[in-house]
């Protein structure tokens, strides 16, 4: 016979499992995409498997599915809130926030900055396709194709807050030039906020593949789980994160119903957190604090806050 405590535990477990199954079913049913399979391949005739390196990944196809794959709306809202809260508390004398988001992707953060009272909110990204999609998603946001490694992209002292979210720092090819330009574009005493991770411990599972927002499977697994799987209406998606030291690969695969496969390989350089702070400080910035994102389920992920 089960005692009352055991009965309650069984009921709670049953509710949890039922909710989990319902959420997974309902979210899968809603994962409809606006893309056509033909958009995923440059050559439609004689290619069954296409492999894209980091310089060619962010095309029209990927731009259209990016937000659904990453599923980062909650994360963007919290990162924007944390960043503005710190910037305003650190510089209460600033009448308005003039923010630049480097590597803005489809512009989610930029639009949130705009709606939260920033006097100026600009986003730049190297990808034409991501900017085009971002303008469709957020028609009022100021999104531009631009390169942070080019000093003339903006004027000196144009911003008092610059951000790099969602692994952008790890994609940079010429970090020295980029940091030098950010230092130039920021007004003296202004803020620079960078997303960073503990590469050994952070959860690489995409939000779309997690059962609940902010839920990490790593707590309940003896070995690190690195593979994400998500079902969409036109393809099956799978991703895997691996690293050896600072060299990391994020591999994605789209399997279409006709048997064609699109594979993508993101190459990143992920230094230790101490090394990242040292790199940024060597460009003239002062490290002030980090904001731990564990409170929203992103363990071992942080917003590093610097001042010019």
What spans do the regions from the language model cover?
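C-terminal lobe and adjacent flexible extensions of AdoMet/dcAdoMet transferase-like proteins
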Residues: 269-308
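A short glycine-rich, Lys/Arg-flanked "PGG" loop and its adjoining helix->strand segment in the class I
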Residues: 176-191
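Conserved class I S-adenosyl-L-methionine
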Residues: 21-94, 96-103
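Class I SAM-dependent methyltransferase SAM/SAH-binding core
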Residues: 106-151
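SAM-dependent methyltransferase
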Residues: 196-277
